[in-house]
Amino acid sequence: MKHSNKPYDSFQDELEDYIKVQKARGLEPKTCFRRMRGEYLESCGYREEFDSRPRYRMFDQRIPSGTNHSYPRSCSSSQTEDRVPQWLPAHDKIRLNSLNYCQFTRDGFSEKPVSLNLSQQEYNCGSYSVESVVHKDLCSGHSTIDPQVSHRQMYQKRKRHLEEGRERQEERPKHERKRSSEEMDLNKHKSIQRKKTKAETETVQDGTEKLKNRKEKKNRDVSSKKEDRKRRKEKKEQGEERTEEEMLWDQSILGF
């Protein structure tokens, strides 16, 4: 019994026709190849990776060799995984596996035989589409940076740092000169203040010494006057206190 090559309006019609052919041959094909992606993620609890390739092998083993056709395949899951970067997160790998499986099922049930060159072209296009999807997913969350722009920014930043360092080195002597002039002015002011305070203290000391000398001189004059007065008084008292012999002598000789 030959397989019909009539075109199908949908995948469901093609699948029903395939089931009828297999039942006519006495085989019981599996109709549930894969659940929907959302149901799979919900049931499996967001598993990181899964391997659906044994199902493909079981399905290929159930089909007789007479009905096998050279169907175009975009790329296998192992090839797609080899082309995927290792730094992709787990959910991106799951997404790529699901895209690969859908592409495989569509190509597997198409009834049109394709030449080798066309299958190779579709393989290249499929791999390019997968890579473009990965690139879009990555670019949606991360902004791409042009390496030339980054090198230019680094060069400008380094140049700016060098210019700032030169400006600091040029400004340092200015600050040092300004600081030295300020220190000189401060030292000069301090020396003037010291001289002024020294002169004031000297004048105060001179004044106190003069006052002290004047006071001492005055005290000496007063004491000398007192001593002279005391001597005069003593002489006078001595003159008044004559003895009887002196008085008789005076009377006899002088006639007093």
Swiss-Prot record:
Amino acid composition bias (Basic and acidic residues), ranges on this chain: 161-188, 218-227
This protein's record includes keyword Coiled coil: yes
Encoding gene per record: Krcc1
Protein name: Lysine-rich coiled-coil protein 1
Keywords from the UniProt entry: Coiled coil
TM segment ranges: none
Biased composition (Polar residues): 64-79, 141-153
Region described as Disordered: 61-83, 141-256
Organism: Rattus norvegicus
Residues in coiled coil: 208-247
